[in-house]
Structure formats: structure tokens, C-alpha cells
Amino acid sequence: MAHIKVVRRSMRPEEWNDLRFGWLKRYIINDKLPIDNIVIKDARQVTENNYEFYSDEYRPLKKGDLYFTPDGTAFIKAETEVPDSLKNKELWLYLKTAAEIIVKANGKFVGGIDPNRDRVLLTPYIGTPDKIKFEMQGYNRSKPDDERNPESLAVRGCRQIFNGAYLVTI
């Protein structure tokens, strides 16, 4: 195995500021528009691209609702108007989740959201249209990630409380 010589040194103040600002930028949001008309349909994957749905109809998904089933897939749809105040700005979809969600906006894949990524940049893919139609497919694990905690070992199911989805500018 090759060894890499590590040079230990202090960071210059500029480097430290750049590093910290990069961390802080993740939490600075200029405009935050809630996406209200979200609907969801829960399913269980039977085989590849074959799902058994728990209901034939989509149900509304509101802030504070439980969503996802243990080891389940959810199909989520939403549509929102882009106000004039957000036109010609860099738009992002912001959604906190413990699941893995792939996102389409106006029919184009724009990226994914997961516990490590809570937003997706939209503008390079769809510009700034008058309306944005979202289609999302998410997968939720059947147990928490932290297996060191004896209490979480007995828990089967990572149901989540929906905290809302937002159209934001940064």
C-alpha cells in the first residue's frame, strides 16, 4: 500500500473563511415559497419497475402528515406557479427527508434528494417557467441507519413526518 506524505499546517484566514462560508451557504435561503398542492401514493416494490399500490388514488400530503411506509416506495406529485418575484433567479426545490427521492421537474430529471442533500437546483434544466410540475419517486428504508443504538434495533419502519416542500432561492 502506498503511503502519502501528509503536510500539516494551519489554514490561512482566507481558507478558513471560504470553508466556513461554504458550510453556511447551505443554510442561507433568500426566498421560500411553500408548495401546497402535493399528493402522494404509497406502494411496495414487487419486482423491478413493478409496484403493488396500497391505494388506487393519490392522497393529499400536508405539512405534519406521516408519509412513507417501511421499506416502501412513494410516488409524489406537485405543481406550483412561479411568482414574478422569483423569475430570472436561480430556483431550487427544498425538501428535508430521510428517504432517497429522485426528482423530475417539467418532465426532466433534475437530481435527487436524500438525508445528505436537501435541495435540488432546477434552473439549468427547466429555466424559470410560469409553472413547475414535479414528479418524484422515493424509497424509504425499513429501519434506522444507526444500528449502534439498541432501542433503534427493535424499530422496524422509518415513517416520517412531512415538513413541507419549498421553491427557494439562495
Where are these regions (language model features)?
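Extended low-complexity, serine/threonine- and proline-enriched intrinsically disordered segments
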Residues: I35-F53, E100-G107
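Aromatic-lined ligand-binding clefts that engage carbohydrates, nucleic acids, or primary amines
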Residues: S85-A105, D114
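Short Pro/Gly-enriched beta-strand edge/turn motifs at strand-loop
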Residues: Y58-G64
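Intrinsic-disorder/low-complexity, polar/charged segments enriched in Ser/Thr/Lys/Arg/Asp/Glu/Gln
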Residues: T73-E79, E90-W92, K131-K133
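Solvent-exposed residues in well-ordered beta-strands and their adjoining turns
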Residues: E81-P83, K96, Q137-Y139
